[in-house]
């Protein structure tokens, strides 16, 4: 099942690299970026790439039967993490890493002690890979990705809204629900 979910993500990565081979040429601010998302919505692409980050990490731990598959899965994990980060949409990437943390906790809880050493090694290497990908992403975006995750604009000023204005929408939708709890508004 993991492989069946991973194959379309591999095709998505190929398309994204064909659509936008150079990140430096298209990143100009800290907003979500349609160009680095293959021309699609950055939030949706980030979500599916976050799923890919999780899937390839799980493939590294559970489905790497030999060194060749381990290397292939690790390369795809690194590439999909990079492309997920440079969409400038934080939700999918953060969700992918939260799923990894949850999976690692479950694996550590349910595996025997001799298998735990492999999990620790993979987690350590994953952290090293992520730090390397983050540094490369920061270089490719001239530091704008650091500002995006720090909730700053391109000039380094803190943005007024941590949710890019969504809190107003959330508040109004919640108020409409409270005003019309039975029949709704439309």
Where do the protein language model's features map onto the residues?
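Glycine- and aromatic-enriched periplasmic loops at the membrane-periplasm interface
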Residues: 167-173, 183-186
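A membrane-periplasm/extracellular boundary helix in multi-pass inner-membrane enzymes
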Residues: 18-20, 82, 86-87, 104-157, ...
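Luminal/periplasmic active-site loops of membrane-embedded glycosylation enzymes
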Residues: 44-50, 152-166
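Juxtamembrane loop-helix boundary motifs flanking transmembrane segments in multi-pass membrane proteins
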Residues: 27-28, 165, 169
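Generic structural signal for secondary-structure transition and capping sites
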Residues: 10, 179-182
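Alpha-helical transmembrane segments of multi-pass inner-membrane proteins
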Residues: 2-29, 40-110, 133-136
């Amino acid at each position: 099942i993991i492989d069946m979910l991973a194959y379309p993500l591999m095709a998505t990565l190929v398309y994204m690299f064909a659509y936008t081979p150079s990140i430096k040429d298209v990143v100009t601010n800290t907003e979500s970026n349609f160009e680095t998302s293959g021309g699609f919505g950055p939030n949706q692409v980030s979500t599916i790439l976050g799923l890919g980050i999780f899937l390839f990490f799980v493939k590294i731990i559970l489905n790497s039967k030999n060194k060749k598959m381990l290397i292939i899965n690790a390369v795809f994990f690194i590439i999909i993490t990079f492309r997920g980060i440079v969409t400038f949409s934080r939700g999918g990437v953060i969700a992918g890493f939260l799923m990894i943390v949850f999976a690692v906790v479950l694996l550590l809880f349910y595996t025997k002690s001799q298998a735990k050493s492999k999990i620790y090694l993979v987690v350590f290497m994953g952290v090293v890979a992520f730090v390397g990908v983050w540094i490369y992403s920061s270089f490719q975006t001239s530091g704008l990705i650091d500002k995006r995750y720090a909730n700053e604009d391109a000039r380094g000023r803190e943005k007024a809204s941590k949710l890019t204005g969504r809190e107003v929408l959330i508040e109004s939708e919640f108020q409409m629900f409270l005003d019309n709890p039975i029949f709704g508004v439309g």
